[in-house]
Structures are given as structure tokens and as C-alpha cells.
UniProtKB/Swiss-Prot annotation:
Keywords: Cell projection, Cytoplasm, Cytoplasmic vesicle, Cytoskeleton, Golgi apparatus, Nucleus, Phosphoprotein, Repeat, WD repeat. InterPro entries: WD40/YVTN_repeat-like_dom_sf, WD40_repeat_dom_sf, WD40_rpt, WDR11. This is WD repeat-containing protein 11. It is found in: Cytoplasm, Cytoskeleton, Cilium basal body; Cytoplasm; Nucleus; Cytoplasm, Cytoskeleton, Cilium axoneme. The lineage of its organism: Eukaryota, Metazoa, Chordata, Craniata, Vertebrata. One of its GO terms (biological process) is neural crest cell migration. GO terms for cellular component: axoneme; ciliary basal body; cytoplasm; cytoplasmic vesicle; nucleus; trans-Golgi network. It holds the Pfam family Beta-prop_WDR11_1st. WD repeats lie at residues 63-112, 115-158, 358-398, 476-515, 571-610, 713-750, 752-792, 798-836, 898-944. It comes from the Eukaryota. Involved in the Hedgehog (Hh) signaling pathway, is essential for normal ciliogenesis. Regulates the proteolytic processing of gli3 and cooperates with the transcription factor emx1 in the induction of downstream Hh pathway gene expression and gonadotropin-releasing hormone production. WDR11 complex facilitates the tethering of Adaptor protein-1 complex (AP-1)-derived vesicles. Component of the complex WDR11.
Length: 1239
């Protein structure tokens, strides 16, 4: 590199990187969007890590040998601290059955797992949080599920099933439930645990394909709404018997997923419909169908925050469908009363533009942002990644009566709290802040609240990443960096493609600089003639005479102008074999297949010489690096100085000007050299078919023939030549390299035994004698001084792609084009490299705290959460007393700067409450466990604070505006939960289609206390049914139950006997009939039916009794064998046991969360003060202060220590002492201190 000659060095460090292109069909399902905010995507055997906000590829992971078929980010549902930091962990699986768990920032494989050698069908990390975070479940074909420890790579257990497993889905509400989609149906597993494999073979159900049911065979044209009516008749889709052969030929179910928005619901996707099942009845309760002319589905993603579905269609269109609220709005007349209660209806609320689908271009997958659920990314087979963002805009009203859909209303809350006056907010922060929750009859007022606006949703394309087109490619790097061009140098790589366009990439950023459509056929070669212009040539397919159309274009990058360099020539002539530009970029040689070569002047674009017919056929050609430009310049300079002397005035002060005038003249001269008369002498050598070497000299427009060197007997037909300094290298078709030392007049042959030498190129940089050699099966780097090989890469041995073209991009990095459609920039050792992300030189800064060091990430979080020591909130870390290396400070500041202006202004808004801030920061960090905790905490802290103000004992009679979304299930308010369950039974009742279903509905109604409806259902039993008598008696019993003592005690006795003899459900029913639901819950808990008991408590018991049941459940969740403390905390939050939650947080060492939670409780006045609580407050605040001290935020530590009262005195003294002496205790000591619990 020339930079060694100058005192300062220029930073042109090119990172090793991979430019990727089209995807392989096996990469179709390999894409995932993690809570960390990044997208991982498989491309052949590499994995791209993409930042969706700036649409940049920030890492490429290379280690797989086969195509990547699945990628999965690990979940972030645990409390983050120094010992369990924010980290980017990704699992990827390939077509050869290998799973790799990556540390994405460093690009290193954390562990590798291999069981069989077939493609992994599906895999996912376990979500049950307090268990191990490292567990990974994978489907190894054909029929095994294996649980792995993703940290160590050890196998925990393995289980086989009778059918081939296609995919699986975890129940998001119950970690022990898992559903497998198999080739014949669905297998439900209810005893999934990480400690041992499932015991049974699971419950198998078969899917009768909806199209084979008789309802569909009716001609649809008979009635106008044929499709709808037919779909309503598809009642049963799930049978326990295996369907007959003609009924189901093939399970064409594309996908199965549990709905994360409500418990016990699942969706099945078929090409033309989505079925929503209620698993308690295993019964369809909703169908989303595509009309005849519509475009079939490929994939659907259910949302958690709202009952909504993102669907991907075969034309690449993404649609959003939102479940319609069942309450009719007041101004809406119910036209079809039956339809209203018939089923769940998902209305199409928004759709994005389709893409142009061709044979090679089709949509593969869509992923949505798991944190906010308002962005979707579409991956297309040609390597494009399209980022669609959902935007909500409010409209006045009633504008969508035309569409016939009930309106959608905006959400009331921002970050869990109703907005205050002039508070800044981000309406499009997440799906649940864009649209309000679905209403439930009997609980919600059907009219929108005062501040709810009607909203419309729109998709906007906010980012696009495109890949390279299909190979083959030809590569050429622009001229190397020198001392002269150092100020304006850009490392540009030109890539010629098969469709005739030339892509120019800037290799510092890896981004496409220009895409130029230059030719009409495949580009065969490119030669740069300056830093901003190049010549490229392309040849068409030969006709029957073997003649082609040659295109040789001159392209100027700055303007994009291209013109045909050879003018009118080029039609019907032999194909151009190669073009070679001389070192001074003065002359160009064009070599043809069966026609003598042409010599052109590059600067004027004129033909200097077309060689005679008897000119030898050229097999290889290279320009010599020697020329006489320097001696010419010296002569010119002498003449110039003589001129200057004659014209100089005799004044003394004039002489000081003289030298500068001359230097100006020289500058002008050197600039105009290329365009003006001066023509230096240059030479080139070439070989003919016999291996004879010719030497030709060109000066101006004279061409002289020089000496000839007879062929070397040991070489075959020469294929290529390279020349640098005093070394000339020849390569032949048999794999021999011949090194000539021109100074010492020595030659040395080396057989490489690798077959045809396709290309050889010397590395740039003065005195750099490395040589890059390309063969049909790979490439090698040679050191020509020592005449020995430095590194080698070979197809099948260390890589699985073929190399199509090579070049040097700097003095120590090479660039390879390969047939998997990628262009790789590699170190000279040619090991395929993932790079460290933190060494990347990105064009746009990326917000991703996970890229920081663990301590720095926690500092950033603490900095954003609370700055109570400042009057105003700042986004500048330098304004805070933060003792840390400047480099780390700089990285934190970069993260802060990369936040969007909206978010910055909201964070700096003094109106943002502590609870909103905690929620917003957990969203920014993609911290699942924080987000869940603060959502529930902020809701119930505010609810209990409100009810305390209005002197109500329980927060039941509240404005329904603010109940928790149903996706929180048992954590919701009882009234809301009850309403939801009643609505659900009503739907099940409408949909029931067999005696089994009717019986289940009657049972549910009895538990919910809806006795009249239950009696009606019981009396429906037909006389020929075996349980006719039993049901009739039950109906009589239900209607005659009065609260007289004797009958109650009898029933209670019968119920307890039933339970003791194993009829738990029946006994519980009887207890519910006589209003002894609390006893029923106790029995359920004794027999381990904890969730069922919690459900019953929510729907039947008053607040005090219900909270007893739920507290017992929380205790059970905390027990070591269950170990779901975080879930127990959420249950306690919903009961308002804030002190207990504070103590639990502190004892689990969640110091930051504990301190902020207690602070919020004190602020809202939901913790009364007594000695116990003061003690807790002191301990929590001191520990948080120590944590802040250990991560370097001293002011924060002082603030919290001073708030801790007595407990904080000692720490305050320590802090002020270190201040006084100016010594900062080392973080290692701090962490030891903070491990001691202060009581």
C-alpha cells in the first residue's frame, strides 16, 4: 500500500464482508425478527443480520456448509443484569441437520449441535422464563423431537412419534402444551417439560380437509352468498378417528399456530382459508376465507397485543385482518342477526402493494416486529427485503360506512397511562397504542369514549434492501489507493452481471453506490481507466456462423454517461476475448477469438492499429509496468524552467514567486497530460498458441515489434500472464506456474496440479509481490518473492461454492465472486469470516443496545430510565458524572444519537410519568420480561390508586376504558374476564354440532352460573342417546335447587364423594350449583388443577374469596419444583399485593426493577408506610445505588442512597470519600459489595 510512504495514514480499512444475492429455495423459512430488534435471514449457507430501521446488513455469519433452513433469536423474557446481560444469541439450522448457536456480535459460533444429517424441520427456544434460558427444541426428520441445551450443546432428551412431524407450536399461555403438525393431522402434547420427554404419544386429531366436506361440493352459484353459507356449515373439522381415504387425500394445512391474543385458541392455515379453533371444544369458531378470484395465502402471523392476523399472499401482498368486536355499535343496525353471533369475523383493515411475481421472483416469508407488532418485513426470493410499517391516521368519522365495516377506534392509553394535557406521544409506537382493544358486550360501553378517534390503517414502505442478481459475475476493483488520490479515494468494486448491468459497490460500507444498465447481454469483463470511469465489454450469443455482437462501452460514473467505445464496429464479428488497459491508462488492447487484436488510444478514443491478418493468435496478454513517463517529465521540466528564467523580472522579491508559478505550471501540465500531446512509451507482452512470448512497444501512434522469447518446453498452452516490477508470471492450462525474475534473468516453474489457471493478478501496493491465482476449483495466493503458496481455497474441501471471478481489493484483501450468488471480501488467508459487529463502519448508526458491552448496556438503560438528579432530562451522557473510558462513552452516546427524534422528544418530555418511562424503555430495549411486568404493574398501580381515592374497597366499578387486554388472560379484571368467557360460550353454543359439544357447553354454562341456558341444552338430548335419562335428571336437579339447608348438605356430600372417587369435574359442577365455588376451587387446587381453579375463581368468586385462591396459586408458582416466580409476581400484582411483589423483586436480586417499582408505588400512594415497608424501601434503594455505582453512574448512586434513609448512610459516606480522594474504587470491589444483602 502506498500509504507507507507518507507520514499520516489514511483510514481505508475495508471490513471483510459478504455481498449477498438471491436466496435458495431451502432458505424460504429461514427468517426471524427477534425481541432484540434485528432480523436474521438465511441466504444459501450464510446468515445475514439486518437492522430494519436503517435497512442495513450489519453482520453476515458464515460457518454452515449446507443451506440454512431455520433461524431463531433467543427470547428476552428474563431479568437482565451484569450476570445475565443483554446479548445477541441466535440459533440457526441447516439442510444437513446441523444447528449452530451464535454469539452474533463477535460472529463466533457458541456451540454446534448435530443429531441426524437431514434438514431440521422446525426449532424454537423454550419460553417458560424462570427455567433455563438455554433450551432449544428442534424437529429432526422424519419424526423426532429433541430438546437441546443451546449453551453447551448437550442433548437433554429425544422422543419419536408415529408420523412425520412438519412443525410445532408452543402454547403461549401454558408451557406444558405443545402442538405438532404432522403429515396426517395434529398431535397435542399436554405434558411437555424440560426435565423429561413427554410420556404419552399425545392426543392425535385428524384434520378433514375443508374442501372434501360435502358442504363445499354444492354449486356456489346457487345463492349469492354461497361461499359464506358453505363455510358456516363447515362445523367440524377435527375428528378423533382417522378420516376415510377419499375424504382427505393430503394434509394441505400449511401452518398451525396458537393465538397469543387469547388462551386456548389456535389457527390452521390452508391456501384458501384460515380456520380459528377453540381448543376446549376442538371446534371451528371462525373462518377467514378468500373469495374465488382472491390470491391464496402462504403464511399468517397472529398478533399478541390485539386479536389480529398478518397474512402473506402468493402475490407478495401483506394484509392485516382485525377481529371484529361482537358488540354492535349503537348507530349500527344489525342486518343479519344470526351472522352477528355466528362466529369470529376478521375484517380486512389494511393491505400493502403486491410485488411482480415471476418464475424466479416470489415472496418467501413475512416476519413482524415482536415488540411492537406494527412493522412487517417481506423476504423475496431474489434477495430483496421490504420493510412495511403500519401507520394509523385518525379521521373525523363515518367515512367507512361505504366499506360496510364497523369503525376501528384509537387506543386511549399511551404506554399504559391515559395521556395528559399537551403530553407528547408517539401514536404509532405499537399495535396496541394504534387501535383500542376489542370490546366485549356487557362490560364495555358500545359507544366510543370522548377522546377515542376513528382510525384507518395504512402500510408504508419504509425500507428496502436488495441483493445481487443471479450469477455469473465478473469483478474488477477500481485502481488502488496512492499518495496522490488519497483525498478523494473511494474503494469501488464494479460487478458485471448476466443481464448486462454493472453494479458498483462501495466496499467501506458494503452498500450499492450505482447501478448502471450498460449492456444488453452478459458482461464479460471490466477495466477501469480512472477512479471514476471504466470500460466494460459484453458479447451476445453466437449465431450459426459463430459470430456475435460485441459491445464495448465507456462509462463515466460521475455522470452515468456511457458511449460505445468502438463506434459503429461490433456487429457480426468474432467475440472479444479480453480487453487490457495499459498502466498509465493511455492504451487499450482488444483481443478477439479468431481475429487479430486492435490497439486503441483510450484518451482520444481512436484506433491506433488493427493488426495484419497474419498476426499470431493471442492466448494471453499483459502490459508492462515500466514506462518512460518520468524521463519525459524531466525533459519537459527543464524546458519549462529555461522559459521561466528568460521571462523573470530582475526584482529580488519576484524570485520567491518564481518557484510557485513553476509549480502551478507543473500542476496544470500534469493535469492536462492525459488530454494533451505527451505520450509515454509503454510495452506489452503476449503469447501465441505455441507458447512463444512477443514483446511490443507503443509510443504515441507508433507500434514497434521487439524481442521474441522461444517457448518454455515445460509449459503447456499459456492461459494468462501477470507482470509487476521485475517479476513476470505465466500460467498454463495444465496448472503450471512459471515465475520469471527479469533482473536476475532466472525462471522457475512450479506445477500446482490444480488444472487450468484461469486468472492471475498481482496485489496493489509498492513492493507487494503477492499473487492471486484462480483455478476452476478454487483459488490460491502465492508469494512470488519466496515462490511459495500462502493460502488456498478449494471447492468441496473448505467451501461449498464454486469461484467465478477474483480480484484484489486492497493490498491484503481479496474479493471473490461465487456461484451461490455472493461476492465475498476476504482476508488474504481466504477463511470465510464473520466479523465483529462493533468493528463495523456503518453508514447510518443503528439503535441496538445489545451491541454494547454488558455494563454499558445497563448504564444506558439506567440513564434513560431515570435522571432524578437533574432538573431537566438530557440525552447527552457527557453531562452526567460517568466515569468510564471515553471510547465506551462514545459508543453509548452513539446509541443515544441514533434514537428517532420522536422518541427523544417523548423521553425528554417532563409530562412522561415514571411508569410510562419504564414501559417505553423496556420497549426500546426489546426486554420481554420488563415489558410484561411494567404493563401489568402500571395498570394495577393506577387502578388501586384510583379506587383508593374514590374510597372503594375493590377496583371493580371502574371506567372500562382501562382494563388489561385479554392476552393477559387470568391477570385481567374479573368483570372483564367473566364477560369474555360468557361471550366465548355463546359462540361455542352457536357452533356446536354434536352431542359431545353440547355436553361441554352445558358444563361450561353451569360453571359460569348460567343455569337457564344450561337446562335448555340438557333437555336437547335425544331419547335414543345413552345419557338421555341422566341429562334429563340433571336438568330437573338444576331447576329445583333451592338454598334449603338439607338439599344443600346432601348435594355437598354427593359432590365430595364424587371427587374422592375420581369424578373431579362432576363434583366441581355440583358445588358450583349450590354456590360453593370457593370449595370447588380448593378441591381443584388439591388435585393439581391450578389453572382451572384460577379460572373458576375469576368467573364465580367475589374479590376476597377469589384473591385467596389466587394467592395460593402464586405460592404454588413460587415453589422450587414449579419455579415460575415471575408469573407469580404478575398474579400478585393483579391482586394488589404490592409489598409482597417488592420483597420478591428484592430477594430475587432484581435491584433496578425493585427500586423503580417501589418508587412508583410510593408515588401513587398504594404502599402505606410502616416499619416493614421502610426497611424494604431502604434495602431496595441502597442495593440499586450500589448497582448504579458499579456501572459508573455516581450521581444516581448518591441520589438513591440519600433516599434510603438510615440504610444508605454508610454508602453515602463511601461515595463522598471516593469523591474527596479522587480515587474510584474498582468495579470488581463494587460487585463484591453489592452481592452482600443489606437488611
Amino acid at each position: 500500500m502506498a500509504s507507507t510512504m507518507i507520514p499520516y495514514t489514511v483510514n481505508i480499512k475495508l471490513a471483510a464482508r459478504t455481498l449477498t444475492g438471491t436466496l435458495n429455495l431451502q432458505n424460504k423459512t429461514a427468517v426471524d425478527w427477534g425481541w432484540q430488534g434485528l432480523i436474521a435471514q438465511g441466504c444459501h449457507s450464510s446468515i445475514l443480520i439486518i437492522d430494519p430501521n436503517t435497512a442495513q446488513t450489519i453482520q453476515v455469519l458464515e460457518r454452515h456448509k449446507a443451506n440454512v433452513v431455520k433461524v431463531k433469536w433467543s427470547r428476552e423474557n428474563y431479568h437482565h443484569s451484569l450476570s445475565s446481560p443483554y446479548s445477541l444469541r441466535l440459533a440457526s439450522a441447516d439442510a444437513a441437520g446441523k444447528i449452530i448457536v451464535w454469539d452474533v456480535v463477535s460472529g463466533m459460533a457458541h456451540c454446534e449441535i448435530q443429531e441426524h444429517s437431514k434438514p431440521i424441520q422446525d426449532m424454537d427456544w423454550l419460553w417458560a422464563q424462570d427455567a433455563s434460558r438455554d433450551l432449544l427444541l428442534a424437529v429432526h426428520p422424519p419424526n423426532y423431537i429433541v430438546l437441546w441445551n443451546g449453551d453447551t450443546g448437550t442433548k437433554l432428551w429425544k422422543k419419536s412419534y408415529a408420523e412425520n412431524i412438519l412443525s410445532f407450536s408452543f402454547d403461549p399461555f401454558e408451557p406444558s402444551n405443545l402442538a405438532l403438525l404432522t403429515s396426517e393431522g395434529i398431535v397435542f402434547i399436554t405434558d411437555f417439560s424440560h426435565s423429561k420427554p413427554p410420556g404419552s404419544g399425545g392426543k392425535k386429531v385428524y384434520i378433514a380437509s375443508p374442501h372434501s366436506s360435502p358442504a363445499h361440493s354444492k354449486p356456489a352459484a346457487a345463492q349469492p352468498t354461497g361461499a359464506k353459507k358453505a363455510l358456516n356449515k363447515v362445523k367440524v373439522l377435527i375428528t378423533n378417528e382417522k378420516p376415510t381415504a377419499e375424504a382427505v387425500t393430503l394434509n394441505d394445512c400449511l401452518q398451525l399456530s396458537y393465538l397469543p391474543s387469547k388462551r386456548n385458541h389456535m389457527l390452521l392455515l390452508y391456501p384458501r382459508e384460515i380456520l380459528i379453533l377453540d381448543l376446549e371444544l376442538s371446534q371451528t369458531v371462525g373462518v377467514v376465507a378468500i373469495e374465488r378470484s382472491g390470491v391464496p395465502f402462504i403464511q399468517v402471523i397472529p398478533c399478541a397485543q390485539r386479536d389480529a392476523l398478518y397474512c402473506l399472499h402468493e402475490n407478495g401482498c401483506i394484509t392485516l385482518r382485525v377481529c371484529r368486536s361482537t358488540t354492535p355499535s349503537p348507530n349500527e343496525t344489525v342486518t343479519d342477526p344470526e351472522q352477528n353471533s355466528q362466529e369470529l369475523v376478521y375484517d380486512l383493515r389494511s393491505q400493502c402493494d403486491a410485488i411482480r411475481v415471476t418464475k424466479t421472483v416470489r415472496p418467501y416469508r413475512v416476519v413482524i416486529c415482536p415488540v411492537n407488532e406494527n412493522k412487517a418485513v417481506l423476504v423475496v426470493s431474489d434477495g430483496r427485503v421490504m420493510l412495511w410499517e403500519l401507520k394509523a391516521h385518525a379521521s373525523k368519522s363515518s367515512s367507512n360506512l361505504s366499506s360496510g365495516l364497523p369503525p376501528l377506534y384509537s387506543a386511549v392509553n399511551f404506554c399504559g397511562t391515559p395521556l395528559r394535557q399537551n403530553q407528547k406521544c408517539i401514536p404509532d409506537l405499537s399495535l396496541n397504542s394504534m387501535i383500542g382493544h376489542s370490546l366485549i358486550p356487557g362490560v364495555d360501553s358500545p359507544r366510543p369514549l370522548a377522546d377515542q378517534k376513528e382510525v384507518h390503517l395504512k402500510f408504508l414502505l419504509t425500507g428496502l434492501l436488495s441483493g445481487l442478481p443471479l450469477p455469473p459475475f465478473s469483478l474488477r476493483m477500481c485502481p488502488p489507493l496512492t499518495t496522490k488520490n488519497i483525498n478523494h479515494y473511494q474503494p469501488l468494486l464494479a460487478v458485471g452481471t448476466s443481464n448486462g448491468s454493472v453494479l458498483v459497490y462501495n466496499l467501506t460500507s458494503g452498500l450499492l453506490h450505482k447501478e448502471l444498465s450498460v449492456h444488453s447481454c452478459e458482461v464479460r469483463g471490466i477495466e477501469w481507466i480512472s477512479l471514476t470511469s471504466f470500460l466494460s465489454f459484453a458479447t451476445s450469443v453466437p449465431n450459426n456462423l459463430g459470430l456475435v455482437r460485441n459491445e464495448l462501452q465507456h462509462v463515466d460514473l460521475r455522470t452515468g454517461r456511457c458511449f460505445a467505445f468502438r463506434g459503429e464496429r461490433g456487429n457480426d464479428e468474432p467475440a472479444i476475448e479480453m480487453i487490457k488497459v495499459s498502466h498509465l491508462k493511455q492504451y487499450l488492447v482488444v483481443v478477439f477469438r479468431d481475429k487479430p487484436l486492435e490497439l486503441w488510444d483510450v484518451r482520444t478514443g481512436t484506433l491506433l492499429r488493427e493488426m495484419a491478418k497474419n498476426f499470431p493468435t493471442v492466448t494471453a496478454l499483459e502490459w508492462s509496468p515500466s514506462h518512460n513517463l518520468k524521463s519525459l517529465k524531466k525533459k519537459q521540466l527543464a524546458a519549462r524552467e529555461a522559459m521561466a528564467r528568460q521571462t523573470t523580472l530582475a526584482d529580488a522579491e519576484q524570485s520567491s514567486v518564481e518557484s510557485s508559478v513553476i509549480s502551478l505550471l507543473q500542476d496544470a501540465e500534469s493535469k492536462s497530460e492525459s488530454s494533451q500531446g505527451i505520450s509515454a512509451r509503454e510495452h506489452f507482452v503476449f503469447t501465441d498458441t505455441d507458447g512463444q512470448v512477443y514483446h511490443i512497444t507503443v509510443e504515441g501512434n507508433t507500434v514497434k515489434d521487439g524481442a521474441r522469447i522461444p517457448p518454455d518446453g515445460s509449459m503447456g498452452s499459456i492461459a494468462c500472464i501477470a507482470w509487476k516490477g521485475d517479476t513476470l508470471v505465466l500460467g498454463d492450462v495444465d496448472g503450471n506456474l512459471n515465475f520469471w525474475d527479469l533482473k536476475a534473468r532466472l525462471s522457475r516453474g512450479v506445477p500446482t496440479h490444480r488444472g487450468w489457471v484461469k486468472k492471475i493478478r498481482f496485489a496493489p501496493g509498492k513492493g507487494n509481490q503477492k499473487l492471486l491465482v484462480m483455478y476452476t476449483d478454487g483459488a490460491e495466493v502465492w508469494d512470488t518473492k519466496e515462490v511459495q503458496m500462502v493460502s488456498s481455497i478449494r471447492v468441496g474441501r473448505n467451501v461449498n461454492y464454486r469461484i467465478l471471478d477474483i480480484d484484489w481489493c486492497t493490498s491484503d484483501k481479496v474479493v471473490l465472486a461465487s456461484d451461490d450468488g455472493c461476492v465475498r471480501v476476504l482476508e488474504m488467508a481466504m477463511k470465510s469470516a464473520s466479523y465483529r459487529m462493533d468493528e463495523q463502519d456503518l453508514t447510518d448508526p443503528v439503535w441496538c443496545p445489545y451491541l454494547l458491552l454488558p455494563r454499558a448496556a445497563l448504564t444506558l438503560k439506567a440513564f434513560l430510565l431515570l435522571q432524578p438528579w437533574m432538573d431537566t432530562f438530557t440525552m447527552d451522557i457527557t453531562q452526567v458524572d460517568y466515569k468510564e473510558k471515553d471510547e465506551i462513552k462514545g459508543l453509548i452516546q452513539e446509541q443515544l444519537n441514533s434514537l428517532s427524534n420522536d422518541i427523544k422528544s417523548v423521553l425528554q418530555d417532563p409530562n412522561l410519568s415514571l411508569l410510562q418511562r419504564c414501559l417505553l424503555v423496556s420497549r426500546l430495549f426489546g426486554d420481554e420480561s420488563d415489558l410484561q411486568f411494567w404493563t401489568v404493574a402500571s395498570h394495577y398501580i393506577q387502578a388501586f390508586a384510583q379506587s383508593a381515592q374514590s374510597n372503594e374497597s375493590v377496583p371493580e366499578g371502574q371506567a372500562a376504558a382501562s382494563h388489561l387486554d385479554i392476552c393477559h388472560d387470568i391477570l385481567c379484571e374479573s368483570s372483564f374476564f367473566q364477560g369474555f368467557q360468557l361471550e366465548r360460550v355463546r359462540l361455542q353454543e352457536v357452533k356446536r354440532s354434536s352431542y359431545e359439544h353440547t355436553k361441554k357447553c352445558a358444563d361450561q354454562l353451569l360453571l359460569l352460573g348460567q343455569t337457564d341456558r344450561a337446562v335448555q341444552l340438557l333437555l336437547e338430548t335425544s331419547a335414543d342417546n345413552s345419557s338421555y335419562y341422566c341429562d334429563s335428571l340433571k336438568a330437573c336437579l338444576v331447576t329445583t335447587i333451592t338454598s334449603s339447608g338439607p338439599s344443600q348438605s346432601t348435594i355437598k356430600l354427593v359432590a365430595t364423594n364424587m371427587i374422592a372417587n375420581g369424578k373431579l369435574a362432576e363434583g366441581v359442577q355440583l358445588l358450583c350449583l349450590i354456590d360453593k365455588a370457593a370449595d370447588a376451587c380448593r378441591y381443584l387446587q388439591t388435585y393439581g388443577e391450578w389453572t382451572r381453579a384460577a379460572w373458576l375463581a375469576k368467573v364465580r368468586l367475589n374479590a376476597a374469596e377469589g384473591s385467596d385462591v389466587l394467592k395460593r396459586w402464586a405460592e404454588h408458582l413460587c415453589s422450587p419444583q414449579v419455579n415460575q416466580k415471575s408469573k407469580a409476581m404478575l398474579v400478585l400484582l393483579s391482586l394488589g399485593c404490592f409489598q409482597k411483589v417488592g420483597e420478591m423483586l428484592h430477594s430475587m436480586r432484581y435491584f433496578d426493577r425493585a427500586a423503580l417499582f417501589i418508587e412508583a408505588c410510593l408515588k401513587y400512594g398504594v404502599m402505606e408506610t410502616n416499619d416493614d415497608i421502610n426497611k424494604l424501601v431502604g434495602a431496595a434503594f441502597v442495593d440499586y445505588a450500589k448497582l448504579l455505582r458499579s456501572i459508573g453512574l455516581k450521581q444516581g448512586a448518591v441520589h438513591w442512597a440519600s433516599r434510603a434513609g438510615e440504610a444508605g448512610k454508610q454508602l453515602l459516606e463511601d461515595l463522598s470519600q471516593t469523591e474527596g480522594t479522587g480515587t474510584e474504587s474498582s468495579p470488581a470491589d463494587d460487585t463484591d459489595n453489592s452481592l452482600v444483602n443489606i437488611e
